Structures are given as structure tokens and as C-alpha cells.
């Protein structure tokens, strides 16, 4: 049974909704299509999500299943009132309604997963992690073409933890490459990155936060001074604008939020599987 779509909706990254929903769905012998809709944090976004869900139901001729971890009650109320899918809140009772909706009995086994698919996904993630480690901080130019995404930004802007999270959570081969003063002087991307421009995504950060982070590593140095951080960030953002590189600020975002935002931009299909 595969012609059924399951949505995971959250006003955050959606990881909790997806994890919880998948734990419930693993009790059933089905292989549905998964769609994660993160950052549904306004009524307008809720309406967009509702249109997506309802349209999917019309196309498939079956109600989509919708797991949600929405915290905002106004947004949740809109979803409950207008969504034609089977809506399951995190705090509801899940298994019994799914038995009724799917027309099959739950296996009632804890932690039941498809061994073959999980093994393949596990192998892909290990391969992605090894790739990301080998291509951390520009240490290898070899096989950059094999990257799913190449993160660029100044030192300590969050590139390494984000690439590793993308590899571990999504199996993406994520490289990262530092932008350094020599690049700013040449006013060009590092030569190794030029052929892969379409795969590049930039990270920036508030100079004050960057200075704080760098001071933990190299206190009272030119490298960590606020003036130097301001200059590097200014030059890096100017380069990204010149090169037409998409970028975001990591200043107030968690690694999960950064990774999910990047995924939405460069590989939205990875939110469906």
C-alpha cells in the first residue's frame, strides 16, 4: 500500500513530528509517501499547507494522513477546520484511529522497522558522513562534484556542524569551504568552487556573535576582534551577493533549523520520500 501520502507539519523543523509519526507508521505494513512541511508558523503558511494537503487528497482519491506538532493554537484551529486530511495531533491517541482509517490492524510491536530500507538508509548516511568529514573546511578538492551541497562562509560561522547534521540526518554529501581574506582581496570565489557554483549555499553570522565564538578559541587576537569579524562578514556577504549565492544567517538559529532551511532551498525533494 504505497499510494497514500503522509504529511508532517510543524511550526518548527518538523523533525519531532516526523520521528513520532514514523514510529507509529512503522506498526503498519505500508510504504506511504512522506512530505515534511516545516516552519508553518503563520496562518498564511497554514493555508498554503492546507491547499497542498487537500490537493494531494483530490489527486489520490484518499485522505492524506497528517501528523502535527503545531504549538500555536490559532494555526492548529485553522488546520483542523479546513484540512481534509486525517489530522493527528501529537497528544492525541494515534494507533486506534489509524487502524480505522487504514483498514488494517496494528502489529502492536515496539520499534518495528523495515530492515532492508533502514539498512540502505543507514549505509547511505555513513557514506555521506565519511564524505563530509573528508571535505570539511576545504581540506580536499577531490570529488567536490559529488557534493549535494557546498556550504561557504567565514571561519566559525557554523559550516562544519551543519554539514555533519545534513549528512547524519538526511544522508546528504555536504562539503564546506571557508571564505578567507585572500578570497576577499581577489574578489572572487576560491577557484576550486567556481565549477560547482550551483551547489553553493552561504552561511553568515552577526559580527558580535562571531567575535564571541572566536574569542573562545583564540582570545584577544586579531582573528577574533570585533573589527576583523565585521570586515570579514561584510566582505563575505558582498561576495555572496555578487556571485548570486543563496545564504542565511546562523546567528539565532539551531543547527536543525539551519539544515532544514538549506534543505528547503536546495533539495526540497529530500523532504519527500
From Swiss-Prot:
Catalytic activity: [pyruvate, water dikinase] + ADP = [pyruvate, water dikinase]-phosphate + AMP + H(+); [pyruvate, water dikinase]-phosphate + phosphate + H(+) = [pyruvate, water dikinase] + diphosphate
Pfam families linked: Kinase-PPPase
Binding site for ADP: 153-160
Origin superkingdom: Bacteria
Family assignment from sequence similarity: Belongs to the pyruvate, phosphate/water dikinase regulatory protein family. PSRP subfamily.
HAMAP family linked: PSRP
Protein name: Putative phosphoenolpyruvate synthase regulatory protein
Species: Polaromonas naphthalenivorans (strain CJ2)
Amino acid at each position: 500500500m504505497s499510494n497514500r501520502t503522509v504529511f508532517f507539519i510543524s511550526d518548527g523543523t518538523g523533525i519531532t513530528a516526523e520521528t513520532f509519526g514514523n514510529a507509529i507508521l512503522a506498526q503498519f505494513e505500508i510504504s506511504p509517501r512522506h512530505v515534511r512541511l516545516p516552519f508553518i508558523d503563520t496562518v498564511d503558511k497554514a493555508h498554503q499547507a492546507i491547499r497542498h494537503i487537500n490537493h494531494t487528497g483530490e489527486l489520490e482519491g484518499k485522505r492524506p494522513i497528517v501528523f502535527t506538532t503545531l504549538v500555536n493554537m490559532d494555526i492548529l484551529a485553522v488546520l483542523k477546520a479546513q484540512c481534509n486530511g486525517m489530522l493527528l495531533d501529537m497528544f492525541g491517541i494515534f494507533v486506534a484511529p489509524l487502524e480505522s482509517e487504514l483498514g488494517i490492524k496494528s502489529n502492536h510491536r515496539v520499534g518495528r522497522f523495515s530492515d532492508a530500507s533502514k539498512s540502505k538508509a543507514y549505509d547511505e548516511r555513513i557514506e555521506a558522513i565519511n564524505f563530509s568529514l573528508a571535505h570539511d573546511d576545504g581540506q580536499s578538492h577531490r570529488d567536490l562534484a559529488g557534493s549535494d551541497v557546498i556550504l561557504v562562509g567565514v571561519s566559525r560561522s557554523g559550516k562544519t556542524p551543519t554539514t555533519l547534521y545534513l549528512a547524519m540526518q538526511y544522508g546528504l554529501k555536504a562539503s564546506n569551504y571557508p571564505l578567507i581574506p585572500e578570497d576577499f582581496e581577489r574578489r572572487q570565489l576560491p577557484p576550486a568552487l567556481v565549477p560547482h557554483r550551483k551547489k553553493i549555499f552561504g552561511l553568515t553570522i552577526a559580527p558580535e556573535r562571531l567575535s564571541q565564538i572566536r574569542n573562545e578559541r583564540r582570545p584577544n587576537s586579531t582573528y577574533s576582534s570585533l573589527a576583523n569579524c565585521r570586515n570579514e562578514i561584510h566582505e563575505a556577504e558582498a561576495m555572496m551577493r555578487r556571485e548570486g549565492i543563496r545564504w542565511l544567517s546562523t546567528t539565532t538559529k539551531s543547527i536543525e533549523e539551519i539544515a532544514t532551511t538549506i534543505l528547503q532551498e536546495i533539495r526540497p525533494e529530500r523532504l519527500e520520500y
